[in-house]
Every structure is written in structure tokens, then in C-alpha cells.
Regions:
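Short coil/turn segments at secondary-structure junctions
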Residues: 3-7, 67-71, 107-114
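Post-HEXXH active-site segment of zinc metalloproteases
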Residues: 74, 90-121
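Active-site recognition of the HExxH zinc-binding catalytic motif
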Residues: 78-90, 123
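Auxiliary, metal-adjacent structural segments of Zn-dependent hydrolase domains
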Residues: 2-59, 63, 73
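Glycine-rich loops and low-complexity Gly/Arg-rich segments
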Residues: 59-62, 89-93
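Short pre-active-site segment immediately N-terminal to the catalytic Zn-binding motif
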Residues: 62-80
Length: 124
């Protein structure tokens, strides 16, 4: 079951709802998840999107996604799917944040450079 909220400006509500619903139906059909997608300008942060777990982190089911609001439809779709894949990784327990550290399959990768992070490689 999916509980989806979205907010922001300069984005297609229909596209957002369609992508998130498709993803959850395909990859997380037996999980209850709550996802809020906030569309905003992220150029200052030099990112197109990011996702995180809303605490508590134990059995995460509530997520926030921030996504840049000025992208082409194809770039928007690719970015949102990338961030949703991180949601999947957290729900399945592959990616965990504990005690200020980030674990991938039980191994601490807190000091791993972005381009070498296994969860980012998998999400691409």
C-alpha cells in the first residue's frame, strides 16, 4: 500500500503520481510505504534529487524525496526512479543508516566516496 504526498512548484503532479505508483506496485507491492516528494530548486546544493528515511530507521517505511523542479520529463523520470531505488534499498534492508553511519549489506561505508558507494552504483 502506498501513501503518497507531493508538493512544490513547476512539476507535473500526474507524472509524479504515475511514476511513484508504478514503482511501488512493481518493486514493493507487499509493503506499506509513505513517500513525500517535494519539488524545489536544488541547484545551490548541486544535486537533482535525494532521498532519506524519516526516523525511526528501524524497519523504515516513511520516506522524504526532494527533487529538482526544473528538469526535462526524461531527466525527471530518471532522477525520481533513482531516488525511489534508494527507498527500495532501505525497505529491503540492504541500505541502513545507524548511529550516524551508512551500512550497505552490513558493511560500514560511511567513508566511501560518492562515486564508489555501492548503493549509488546499483541505483544507476
Amino acid at each position: 500500500m502506498l501513501y503518497l504526498t507531493h508538493s512544490g512548484y513547476n512539476y507535473s503532479r500526474r507524472r509524479c503520481e504515475s511514476i511513484v505508483s508504478w514503482f511501488v506496485d512493481k518493486y514493493l507491492p507487499n509493503h506499506k510505504v509513505s513517500i513525500n516528494v517535494d519539488h524545489k530548486g536544488l541547484l545551490r546544493e548541486s544535486v537533482f534529487g535525494w532521498a532519506w528515511v524519516v526516523p525511526p530507521d528501524h524497519r523504515p517505511r516513511e520516506f522524504e524525496i526532494e527533487i529538482h523542479n526544473r528538469m526535462s520529463p526524461s531527466q525527471y523520470t530518471e532522477t525520481l526512479l533513482h531516488e525511489l531505488w534508494h527507498v527500495y534499498q532501505h525497505v529491503k534492508g540492504i541500505l541502513k543508516d545507524k548511529y550516524g553511519k551508512r551500512y550497505w549489506k552490513g558493511i560500514d561505508h560511511s567513508e566511501t566516496d560518492y562515486e564508489d558507494q555501492p548503493w549509488e552504483k546499483e541505483a544507476h
